[in-house]
Amino acid sequence: MTAKAENKPKILIVDDNVPNLELLQAYLEDIDCQTELSTDGYDALEKVKDGSVDLIILDVMMPRLSGFEVCSRLKSSPETKNIPIIMVTALTELGDIERAINSGTDDFLSKPVNKLELITRVRTMLRIRDLTDKLERTLEYISEIESKLENN
């Protein structure tokens, strides 16, 4: 996880419905997470560029740029591909779930969102993110050692 104020994970919540944003924000602040809000897919893409976001909760049905497209763009970029994404949507058909998975989402929740389920999934995704970061640092360290050994 990237360094944050007081080491709180930073979660970007993207939904064009402001009451939904505020509800999800309240759920996440209850578990001591920093939140940033976005009502638009293009705005969300801009907000992740600084590398400070640890996880994204992403609505699917938004005007201008769907959550599917936002997810696909984030997962195809080397800078953002490792940010976990939980899609949240009223779409529950198998085809919609398949489309979400094919766009690169890490998890999928149906609306209305259950607070306990959301919190559990967020904690799991953050734990996986931490382990992935540690693994990448370890692999870089091993690579450096191998390089030094080859040069000696």
Task: Give the predicted meaning of each segment.
Residues M1-L12, Q25, R137-N152:
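Non-catalytic signal-transmission and effector/linker regions of two-component phosphorelay proteins
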Residues V113-V122, L126, D130:
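C-terminal output helix
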Residues M62, L74:
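Receiver (REC) domain active-site loop signature in two-component systems and cognate sites
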Residues V18-E36:
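Two-component/phosphorelay signaling modules centered on CheY-like receiver
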